[in-house]
Amino acid sequence: MVNSFEKSRFLLVKKLLEGEPLTPGEAAQLAQAMLDPSFDNSLKAAALAALRVRGEQPGEVVGFARALRDRAVRVEYGGEVLLDTAGTGGDGLSTLNASTAAALVAASLGVPTAKHGNRSFSSKSGSADVMEMLGYNINHRADRAVRMLSTLGFTFLYAPNYHPAMKAVVPVRRKLATRTIFNLVGPLANPAFNNVQVIGVARRSLMPVIASAASLLGYDAVLVVHGDPGMDEVSVTGETKILEVRRGRIEEYSITPEDLGLPITGLKELRVANAVESAERVRRALSGRGRRSDEAFIAANAAAALYVAGFEKDLKGAAEAAVQAIREGRPAALLEKAVKASLGM
């Protein structure tokens, strides 16, 4: 006999299969069901597939994000500003981990930063892979993350450690082997509850969805970025589309490397073979000894981070500050301290 609770879950899946959108409350209820190991995997797969085929709506992303936040292991940080640079991933371009490096640049200039990230699923190296290769202990606990934010202004939060409930959807996501709503929700579910963020999006069509969801979730400021030729980063190979979210308003514009005072770079120069190469190039770039193309790529993304956090009034000034910090080796010095702190040293 099916109880009323199970029936309500089934009806939500049925609603999706009929092409109807869910309210944020309904989406949160469905997400909570999907994070329950006892909920039927075939219904989980049906719901995820229906959302993907029809196209996820902002309210649905909001509901799923709220459900993940409710289940997260919290990192209790009380500062006025907290930055993240986590994006959706999935661009498949295998470029240097610019958003991870950008987080360190921003933190080295005094912007408190909790970088939320995971291992790679579609690229040669995810943010967690690179941080680990740099010597960082990605498995430290939440209390250490809080101490690091208080003393260094930086920490890295390895997503699986802070979202243990996500284990319940791993088998289904693996079988589907495609992007699902959880890829969109991940950047919006930082367990430290940051209030400013740069969110890279690999598909331009998803930019309004993420921007609207971020607005509904109450962020103070967000830049949703999509760079040529389809990267979830600020690009130095061409134009970057931006949706800027501030106080509930969304503004659309584009920037080029020239607008930031940075050189245009070929995509080939930014590609890496694996996490080892990405980490080594990030290490050299952050110490001011890297390739100029890597420096420009990192500086462009750091500029977005510094601007959204209110460190600089415009993106060009933010890029100049990022380049100066990199050439002075400030992010490398912070990285060294963060690695030691993550290990409890």
Curated annotation (Swiss-Prot):
GO cellular component: cytosol
Database matches in InterPro entries: Anthranilate_Pribosyl_Tfrase, Glycosyl_Trfase_fam3, Glycosyl_Trfase_fam3_N_dom, Glycosyl_Trfase_fam3_N_dom_sf, Nuc_phospho_transferase
Cofactor binding notes: Binds 2 magnesium ions per monomer.
Pfam families: Glycos_trans_3N, Glycos_transf_3
Keyword set includes Secreted: no
Record carries keyword Transmembrane helix: no
GO molecular function, one term: magnesium ion binding
Keywords tagged on the record: Amino-acid biosynthesis, Aromatic amino acid biosynthesis, Glycosyltransferase, Magnesium, Metal-binding, Transferase, Tryptophan biosynthesis
Cofactor(s) demanded: Mg(2+)
EC number(s) stated in the UniProt entry for this protein: 2.4.2.18
Chain sites annotated for binding anthranilate 2: 173
Domain of life (superkingdom): Archaea
Residue sites binding Mg(2+) 1 per the record: 99, 233
Biological process per Gene Ontology, one example term: L-tryptophan biosynthetic process
List of residues binding Mg(2+) 2: 232-233
Protein residues bound to 5-phospho-alpha-D-ribose 1-diphosphate: 87, 90-91, 95, 97-100, 115-123, 127
Role summary: Catalyzes the transfer of the phosphoribosyl group of 5-phosphorylribose-1-pyrophosphate (PRPP) to anthranilate to yield N-(5'-phosphoribosyl)-anthranilate (PRA).
Protein name: Anthranilate phosphoribosyltransferase
Species of provenance: Aeropyrum pernix (strain ATCC 700893 / DSM 11879 / JCM 9820 / NBRC 100138 / K1)
